[in-house]
Amino acid sequence: MTGKGQGFGFGLGKMKELAEAFKKAQQVQEGAKRLQEELEQMEILGEAGGGLVKVIVSGNQEPKRVEISPDALAQGADLLSDLVTAAMKDAYIKSTATMRERMEDLTSGLELPGF
C-alpha cells in the first residue's frame, strides 16, 4: 500500500505535466497544419543542363510544371529524357530538404521523443 498522500503517483505535478504535454501536442498539430498549407503553396525549382530543363514541384514534392527550352528539344529524345530525370531529382532533393528543415523548425524546443 502507499503511504499517506502518495495515492497512485498522479498528483498535481503530474497533472500539470500532462496538461503541458497536451498543450505541446496541440501546438505541433496546429503548426503541422500551417506547414502543410505552406508546403502546398511553395514552388521549388529543379534544373538540369544549365537551365535547359526546369521542373517545379511543391514543398511536398507534388509536380507543378515542367519547362523545356527549345535548345533541349534539339538535343534528341535520349538526352532530353536524361535532363528531365535529372531536373526531377534536383527538385525532389531540394523539396525534401526544405520539408525536413521546416519540420525541424516546427519541432525544435518541444522536447519531443524521437525528434
Curated annotation (Swiss-Prot):
Q: Which GO terms describe its cellular component?
A: bacterial nucleoid; cytosol
The UniProt record lists the keyword DNA-binding: yes
- Tell me the keywords, alphabetical order: Cytoplasm, DNA-binding
The terms under GO molecular function for this entry are: DNA binding
Supply the Pfam families for this chain.
Answer: YbaB_DNA_bd
Its domain of life reads Bacteria
Q: Spell out the subcellular localization from the entry.
A: Cytoplasm, Nucleoid
Major location (coarse): cytoplasm
Keyword Cytoplasm listed? The answer is yes
| Role | Binds to DNA and alters its conformation. May be involved in regulation of gene expression, nucleoid organization and DNA protection.
The UniProt family comment states: Belongs to the YbaB/EbfC family.
Indicate the quaternary assembly: Homodimer.
Q: What is this protein's name? A: Nucleoid-associated protein Ava_2322
